[in-house]
Every structure is written in C-alpha cells, then in structure tokens.
Amino acid sequence: MCLVFIVNRQPFGGMKLSAFGGGVKAGGPNYCACLVKITDKPESNTDYKQSYPHAYEEEFAHARDINKLYGEQNAFRYLPLKNMVLRLFPGDSNEEAEMIALATKLCHTPLTISFDPNDDRTTALSSTGCTLKKETLDEFLKTMRSYERIRTCGADIPMEMYEEAARRNKYIATAKPVKNGRVELIHYIKEQSISFEFHRYGSILDVPPVE
C-alpha cells in the first residue's frame, strides 16, 4: 500500500537524515515550486537587490500559523542551513555568484564560494563577504561531505559531482539563479512545521505564541 499525504494544515517531511532534497515540505506553500522550472524572462527588469530583502521580510523572516484552528497551532517557519557551498564554473557569471551571496546572507546561511585555481574569482567576489576557496574539482569533491547543501548556477555540471552527492546524501540545487526573491530564497533555507494542540477534553489552555 502506498499512501501520499499532501496537507496544507500540517506540511510534512522529515528533518535531519530522514529528509533528502531541497528542504521543501509536501503540502507547504512552496511545494509546487519543486515541480516546475522557473527562469527569468529575457526582458526582466526586476532588481534582485530589492526583491530579495522584500521577499525575505514578507515570507521567510517570520513563523506563522496559516490555518489558525481553534485549539490547535500549526506553526510553519524557515530555518537557515548549517552551511552551503557554491561551486562556480567558467561559464558562470560573477553576477550570479553575487545574487546567491546576497540570498544566503539574508537567510543567515553561511556560504563558501569554490572555484578552480585557473578561474580565479578572488578579486571579483571579495566584496561578497563569503569564504572564497580556490580548489580543483577533485579537491572540491573531497570536501562536499562537509556542507549541508551544494549550489551551482546550472545543471550542466560534471557527473562526478552528482555521484559524490549521491554517495554522501547531499542535495545539489542546480536551478539557474533568478531575480525574484520569493523563488530564489527557497534554495537557502529549510522548512519546519510544528503542530501543537492546546486543548484538553474541550478545555482551551494557554495559547502559545507562534515563533
């Protein structure tokens, strides 16, 4: 028997090693974003430096109880990742790296930017405030295990990265960075839902704060 639950009231999916993927819970507000490919329009004039902070404050910064049921609290919130690494390749632009750096900073997720010694980005990306590492692909593969999530600017990456990620149970976010913060910031957090009943035998207890 196969049971599939997609419940807005209590979005679910494990934490720690019981969860694999982008940290988005089934039935939650970002569930459908996992099922589609979202890219910027070529003529988009969205300013990511404005969109990202606005999206963080409006959507990602605060816990909330969407359904507000009497006697039951279903808190939904976003948590930062322990750490993340962005692996850059020669075809990736510095602007894409800067977009990702800003997004992780807003989400309080520590970011390391890794690139090949022959593709030195140290000067160009020094203003991001991120940890910068010059390392070959082989050297990078040996360090993948130490990051909670891996980010790239596209899916066209060496197969060795996918193989190492599979061995280490790591998720690689390969979507091309977009300027819309409501979409882009999903890559740099994980969701948590907590259900709590504050009634006993019909009597309502103290209503806990949503935090």
Please name every model-derived segment.
Residues 1-211:
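C-terminal segments
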